Amino acid sequence: MMVSNVKVYDLEESIIASGYPMRTTAEMRPVDEKDIKRCINLSNACNTGNGAHGQYLTGIRVAFDLTCSNKMWVEAERYRFLEFVSSQSTMHRITKFDLSNQYNEYVDPRVIEIMKEKVDAYNNFCNDIDFGLIPQDVGLQLELQEEKKKRYLEILYTNPAGFELTARLTTNYRCLKNIYIQRKDHRLPEWRKFCAWIETLPMFKELCLSGDDNG
């Protein structure tokens, strides 16, 4: 699991905006200690059951690239506000990846060898068709295309859960707080590592974990 190309937006602006409900003016200014104290109090209120006080956290936006296994991706997709910008695709490119470097350490090497064999056989089969090494009358062309589809599907469905892909994601501190609380002690080491990264985000601990045992 790896996180890279991280951008955090509207941190100070959202901290200031957290005070809007109790103000009669709404100008932007530098963040001061009073603002931080207010946000910590809001965090404490959230962590004791009043989640509405954490609304301002939705304004602190985070964009990043995440590289992780298919297994983690399936679980990540349940978070509505963890949005995909774009991602690598096994559906389009499974036969083009360097499989020697695409799996995490928990994938059985025998499975990787099976995948390599299937991909090599598929690519050789396609090359033979493209270069006319297989005689092609009209009837045979249909059979070859069906065989090609079948072999590709075998590769897709044989590919193990430890295959790693990269996606660009966008989310906010409120969503990341939920992920952190739910996943910090998860069985998958990828989730624990991801939660450790969340802790490094600017002021995340102060704004999201103050007064909470999860910190």
Predicted segments, located by residue:
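Family-specific signature for flavin-dependent thymidylate synthase
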Residues: M1-G215
